[in-house]
Amino acid sequence: MAIRSNALSEMTRFWLQARHGCVVSEAVPVKVPYNYSDIDFLALRPDLTPWTLPDGTPITRAIIETKDEHDFDPKGKDFGRRLKEDVQALSDALYISKPKLAHFSLLRQEHYELATRIFGTADFDRLFIVHALDPDVRNEICPILAKTKRIYWLTVHEIVTDLFQWYQRVSNRAGLRHSLMGDLWHLLVGYCGFRPSE
């Protein structure tokens, strides 16, 4: 039974495991003041060979946060506003120091330090997978975050397109049916012919 129970998390797990051959740990608890937060996914390949983002960026170890608020914020405008606030709080640092709060939890000091302890190194990337992100904010901020802090952003459209392109090359598609998401993908894309929207 999956730990996460929303569509974007299910798709992200499928993308990490089936598409990239990653081993994942999910819902890793993180102690924060007065409560617990979590890291949605930690991911790496067992042999530590890099896997790639859709733009070709190599990733060896990653912590991943998924956020889907498409009913409330279909264009990602609010996510863009929140990201700008978090980037201002980050300033030149690698994380937002406690006790400051962050809209995107992987930017918090507690999450960064726990991932460093788990991986045994600070040599890891942070990946945010969201339903959408304001294109202006993304163009302005995300290249700098990627270059200076190894923080990357993808949308569900990019994940679906990447999965679709990969699926075309899979020789044993029925082998994907061992997971619910793989079975759904094989049924909807393979049998029913669903395609990503342009």
Predicted regions and their residues:
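Intrinsically disordered, low-complexity Ser/Thr/Pro/Gly-rich regulatory segments
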Residues: 1-198
